[in-house]
Amino acid sequence: MRQGARAMSGRGWKSVAGTVALLASAAAVAAPVAAPAGGDGLYFPTSLTQAETDEYTRYELLAPETASFRITYEVTATTAGAKYFYNPIRKGSIASDESVRDARLGTPLHFEVVSGTQARADPLMPDADPATQYIRVTLARPVPEHGQARLVIVKTYKDPKSYYQDGTTLVFDRPLGVRRNKVVLPAGYEAVGVSVPAQIRTEPDGRISVSFMHAGAGAAPLVVRAVKDAQVGSAALPQAPGTQRSWESPFEGATEQERLAERAHQDRDIVYFLQQPETHAFSLYHDYTETRAGIDGYANVVRAGSVASQPSATILDTGEQLKVREMSGAELVASGINVGESVEPAAHVVVIPFTPLKAGETLRLRIAETYTAPVSYRLEGKELVFDRSLGRPRNAVVLPGGWYCTFSAAPATLSQLPDGRVRLDYWDDRPEAVDVLLKARRRIEAH
């Protein structure tokens, strides 16, 4: 159930703030060229050079004697009008078995390996390294204004300096600049050392994997060590996760399946833009990828205590604007729209219908709306107070113009928009929601 732009998964209202980090791929890579029109409205970064977001990499370690690993790199190009995307081949690595597909349709895309000099000739890549080779991908369509082009790049690297054996121990030692990653060990290996905080999971085929979201600046200093003493074959296959909820009091917890889901690969993110606190209002947008064949709608349940207005929806892959309908849960059932989940009959729901997905297709949606929530967002004396539980792995809150942060109960990184507004980013790598209690005061010049 999607409730009030929060990913609800039976977490209750646990007050646990996980590790947090800057949404660097959108904020640091994209160099904004224009500030918002004014006020405290939505802001979308723009760039004249190549920019990307939502990066996630899966490293599948092959037999250690090969010094090779298979990379699946999910990335979203965001530069409006871009027809190509360039992916560097890391120095010291020998690339082979490359392929690229369009994430929306699942269809292959044309690509070629070019030199850094060739890449630099493209206005998208003025800073391309002449000594580096690049995979140049021809996009299925130019990136729409404020839209996206989602890609999946697959390749095999051979790199003895990154992946080697130390006696009987397998070592994967590789700084990773992408913020969300998974490393899958070869069959029969168990992890005995991981240098960054990570989820330990078992893949459906029995292989052990480590998955993490990087919570610091710069590359993650990842070192994974593993030894070959784990089960293989049917003995290694994971038991199906249970549906019984956690017994932990005082709240009913999430199911085992929800708690063990890979956080780093979850691609639901949200940005709140606080209006002046006297209004109790905040605009927001949240992005969501639908992957289930036959689904022909998205339902967002308005959280109790909030009033939603001005809803809109866009297919980021194409820039197409979708019609938005507001209805009750009972009316949703009567409409026949398949949103893939049940909704309480009395619930107030924002529904976005779309063409049913075919097998192998995916759809990336951006939903924008304005909420009024006096309990969550208010003015207490001279202090702005934003008190709201946020359930996505990647959350951000932008203060209204003229305000500065005085308290943030949950750790956050701070950055500044071109118009001076302060943005706080909360990356939550734990399965519980992060309870954001944020306070701010007016800047001197804003009086």
Which residues does each PLM region occupy?
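Bacterial N-terminal signal peptides that target proteins for export
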Residues: 4-20
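N-terminal signal peptide c-region/cleavage motif recognized by signal peptidases
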Residues: 25-26, 30
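Lumenal/extracellular ectodomains and adaptor appendage modules
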Residues: 31-447
